Amino acid sequence: MEVAPEQPRWMAHPAVLNAQHPDSHHPGLAHNYMEPAQLLPPDEVDVFFNHLDSQGNPYYANPAHARARVSYSPAHARLTGGQMCRPHLLHSPGLPWLDGGKAALSAAAAHHHSPWTVSPFSKTPLHPSAAGAPGGPLSVYPGAAGGSGGGSGSSVASLTPTAAHSGSHLFGFPPTPPKEVSPDPSTTGAASPASPSAGGSVARGEDKDGVKYQVSLSESMKMEGGSPLRPGLAPMGTQPATHHPIPTYPSYVPASAHEYGSGLFHPGGFLGGPASSFTPKQRSKARSCSEGRECVNCGATATPLWRRDGTGHYLCNACGLYHKMNGQNRPLIKPKRRLSAARRAGTCCANCQTTTTTLWRRNANGDPVCNACGLYYKLHNVNRPLTMKKEGIQTRNRKMSSKSKKSKKGAECFEELSKCMQEKSSPFSAAALAGHMAPVGHLPPFSHSGHILPTPTPIHPSSSLSFGHPHPSSMVTAMG
């Protein structure tokens, strides 16, 4: 079978084909390799693979790990087909992490590692590797390497299962999928081998290639969950990524939550802490009292303000003001109270002849009049008629002063607010957020916290993905 010229995918490399002609010793793979003249320009290839090396390939602790990690996943292989050889990685002196004396590239690792899923919890791929064909070329799908068969000359060294397993625990960062080249399952389907033999049908290869392309997309989404950086955050409330095919971010609890107390991060304390903290500090009206301080004039020990006389002795506020205004000491004996105007003997109103009133006034002639007659004349310039006279003195309940009214209203408002906050949780609390998020099924879930960082939106939702209520203690009032 001949490959169409519009699919220049592969080139023959002597290190992979044991320096022999591909047609004579590898008849089953001859149609999968193209001449270098049909490949992409070297500049574009170098830029693309440098992009993968800078973002996708992790760094390793020893050369054995590096050897185990060179085989590439279907997600990257889809850009060039089913089988691929990278000569600039095989014989590049500028890569110190590869052993120069060994062609240390594994075609048969026990696990299939993808640079897009650098995770200690990554799954076993759908295409198992065949470690029994050391002479075959490098294969992106390890299962296809077993059918290559053939020579066993300077074969590529294969790793033991222990080394292959240890490759999954390497440190690395999940890469960003390359956007320069987008894989097309329809055009690259024929290049993927569907069976170990070379006579496999192209239609069958395209069918399997479509399945592999979908699998590579689903596996490439598992970028964040099982990174070795994530298990360090496990004590903060996250679960292992093995239970969730599509992982979520761990809960974020700032260190300042333990420093400033639970009031700032309590669900009911969004506005500043527990309900008791809403009450402002009222100015203490108790009189200041110091030990051993006494007014030298009246002997008082409690006063709103302590003053001093000319000699430096302490005076209470009343005695100090009196001394300041009058220049003499405040008399200790209160003066006799003057008789009230209502009790003046022989005084009666010149208009209504009443003898009881709250306040005596005088008319225009200077005669004493009661309070009612005096006000009436002052307002109407007419004497008050006798028909309006009443035996009793009508009094009224005076309204409270505005200051006391405001203070009482403020205290009542704060008490009501504190009661409401105790009975019901704050509308900005984590419980309320969970209530709003629960009926919305297509939104990403919160992972043990109502925290601000959103979780990645799942493309393929799984039944094992749990929508848990956020823990109220880790709610960050981020309105800040």
Swiss-Prot record:
Which GO biological process annotations does it have?
Answer: angiogenesis; brown fat cell differentiation; cell differentiation in hindbrain; cell fate commitment; cell fate determination; central nervous system neuron development; cochlea development; commitment of neuronal cell to specific neuron type in forebrain
According to the record, the segments passing through the membrane are: none
Quote the cellular component terms of the Gene Ontology held in the record: cytoplasm; nucleoplasm; nucleus; transcription regulator complex
Instruction: Enumerate the Gene3D superfamilies for this protein.
Output: Erythroid Transcription Factor GATA-1, subunit A (3.30.50.10)
Asymmetric dimethylarginine modified-residue sites:
86
Matching entries from InterPro entries are given as: TF_GATA-2/3 (IPR016374), Transcription_factor_GATA (IPR039355), Znf_GATA (IPR000679), Znf_NHR/GATA (IPR013088)
Q: Name one Pfam family in it.
A: GATA
- Provide the protein's localization: Nucleus
Question: What residues does the Glycyl lysine isopeptide (Lys-Gly) (interchain with G-Cter in SUMO2) crosslink join?
Answer: 389
Compositional bias annotation for Low complexity: 183-201
Residues with Phosphoserine modification: 73, 192
Record-linked PROSITE patterns = GATA_ZN_FINGER_1, GATA_ZN_FINGER_2
Q: Where are the zinc fingers (GATA-type)?
A: 295-319, 349-373
Which superkingdom is the protein from?
A: Eukaryota
Alphabetized GO MF terms: C2H2 zinc finger domain binding; chromatin binding; DNA binding; DNA-binding transcription activator activity, RNA polymerase II-specific; DNA-binding transcription factor activity; DNA-binding transcription factor activity, RNA polymerase II-specific; RNA polymerase II cis-regulatory region sequence-specific DNA binding; RNA polymerase II-specific DNA-binding transcription factor binding
Which keywords does this chain's UniProt record carry? Activator, DNA-binding, Isopeptide bond, Metal-binding, Methylation, Nucleus, Phagocytosis, Phosphoprotein, Repeat, Transcription, Transcription regulation, Ubl conjugation, Zinc, Zinc-finger
- Per the record, the major location class is nucleus
Q: Where is this region: Disordered?
A: 166-208, 457-480
User: Whom does it interact with, and what assembly results?
Assistant: Interacts with BRD3. Interacts with AR and CCAR1. Interacts with MDFIC.
Q: Tell me, what does this protein do in biology? A: Transcriptional activator which regulates endothelin-1 gene expression in endothelial cells. Binds to the consensus sequence 5'-AGATAG-3'. Plays an important role in the regulation of phagocytosis in alveolar macrophages, particularly during P.carinii infection.
Task: Kindly provide the name given to this protein in its UniProt entry.
Answer: Endothelial transcription factor GATA-2
Source organism of the structure: Rattus norvegicus (Rat)
